[in-house]
Swiss-Prot record:
Signal peptide (residue range): 1-15
Key word Nucleotidyltransferase present: no
Main location, first listed in the record: membrane
Lipid moiety-binding region (N-palmitoyl cysteine): 16
Subunit structure comment from the entry: Monomer.
Cited Gene3D superfamilies: 2.40.128.200
Disulfide bonds: 35-100
Gene name of the encoded protein: mliC
The protein's role, per its UniProt record: Specifically inhibits C-type lysozymes.
Descriptive protein name: Membrane-bound lysozyme inhibitor of C-type lysozyme
SUPFAM superfamilies, per database record: YdhA-like (SSF141488)
Positions where lipid (S-diacylglycerol cysteine) attaches: 16
GO cellular component terms given for this protein: cell outer membrane
Length: 107
């Protein structure tokens, strides 16, 4: 019985890991923006209410916050604000990426 458990337990744990990764991918959209001729790839995790993207060789993970209009994500230093097919990225309230237009939006 112990030998069977030793063999099956890693398989069961691997299956759980695979399931978690699959659910994570299902809840994540990849959004491609063009910001003043610069590309910006944003991963939107709907379950975590979080966006992730690379800016200046740094991976940023921003959590959804309050917004009067549109959707805003922030970590207290950086902010990603989007409304419709447009977005803006801020660093300490200064615009660092502007005129970001969503490419090939889903309708």
């Amino acid at each position: 019985m112990k030998k069977l458990l030793v063999v099956l337990l890693p398989t069961l744990l691997a299956g759980c890991s695979y399931y978690d990764a699959m659910v994570e991918r299902m809840n994540t959209d990849t959004l491609e923006y063009r910001c003043d001729e610069k590309p910006l790839t944003v991963s939107l995790n709907k379950q975590r209410e979080q966006v992730s993207f690379v800016l200046d060789d740094k991976m940023l993970h921003l959590n959804q916050g309050r917004a009067a209009s549109g959707t805003r994500y922030t970590d207290g230093i950086y902010a990603f604000w989007s409304k419709g097919d447009e977005a803006t990225v801020y660093h300490r309230d200064n615009i660092v990426l502007n005129h970001c237009q969503l490419q090939n939006p889903k309708r």
